[in-house]
Amino acid sequence: MQKMAMLMACLACMGLAAAFSPATLGVNKPSHRQQAPVMSQVARRELLSKVLGAAALLGAASADAKVNYDAVAYLGGAQQIDVNNANIRVYQKLPGMYPSAAGKLCTNGPYVDLKDMYAKAKLSKEEEAIVKEFDKDFLFLKPQIEYVVDNLNNGLYRR
């Protein structure tokens, strides 16, 4: 699949180079006579455009994106929260958690379990007391790069 993608990239570059060559034959004729070309420039350009068109149609690769994440409900849509993947805004629903304790949970993860979370999160005594109220709601699933990258800033801004 990568070979096909590389071929497509090469063919696309060749198409761009052809776009900047003179469109009509004989616009800048030299003063002396040249030997007749075996294949005319126009025919070569037409052949190249057909090859590129066929390559684009036949070689279009499907995206390998992860479409469905099984635990998406735990990112804020369910009672339980996946601590390793949830965005900081999810903790706004939990009184006293946002922004201080939630920020520390998101910054110092990922965690294996509750014990690991309390050891790594660097919570103050007050924050730890607040977080303990919600222990039953926390899950510790495997971190997914698609969600960990947005733990602190999901890029959604209000006007």
UniProtKB/Swiss-Prot annotation:
GO biological process: photosynthesis; photosystem II stabilization
Name of the gene: psbU
Sorted UniProt keywords: Chloroplast, Electron transport, Membrane, Photosynthesis, Photosystem II, Plastid, Thylakoid, Transit peptide, Transport
Listed name of the protein: Photosystem II extrinsic protein U, chloroplastic
Subunit: PSII is composed of 1 copy each of membrane proteins PsbA, PsbB, PsbC, PsbD, PsbE, PsbF, PsbH, PsbI, PsbJ, PsbK, PsbL, PsbM, PsbT, PsbX, PsbY, PsbZ, Psb30/Ycf12, at least 3 peripheral proteins of the oxygen-evolving complex and a large number of cofactors. It forms dimeric complexes. Part of the oxygen-evolving complex of photosystem II.
Membrane topology, from the record: Peripheral membrane protein
GO cellular component, one term: chloroplast thylakoid membrane
InterPro entries (UniProt xref): PSII_PsbU
The organism's place on the tree of life at top rank: Eukaryota
Record's subcellular location: Plastid, Chloroplast thylakoid membrane
Family: Belongs to the PsbU family.
Pfam families per the UniProt record, alphabetical: PsbU
UniProt keyword Transcription regulation, yes or no: no
Stated role: One of the extrinsic, lumenal subunits of photosystem II (PSII). PSII is a light-driven water plastoquinone oxidoreductase, using light energy to abstract electrons from H(2)O, generating a proton gradient subsequently used for ATP formation. The extrinsic proteins stabilize the structure of photosystem II oxygen-evolving complex (OEC), the ion environment of oxygen evolution and protect the OEC against heat-induced inactivation.
Originating species: Karenia brevis (Red tide dinoflagellate)
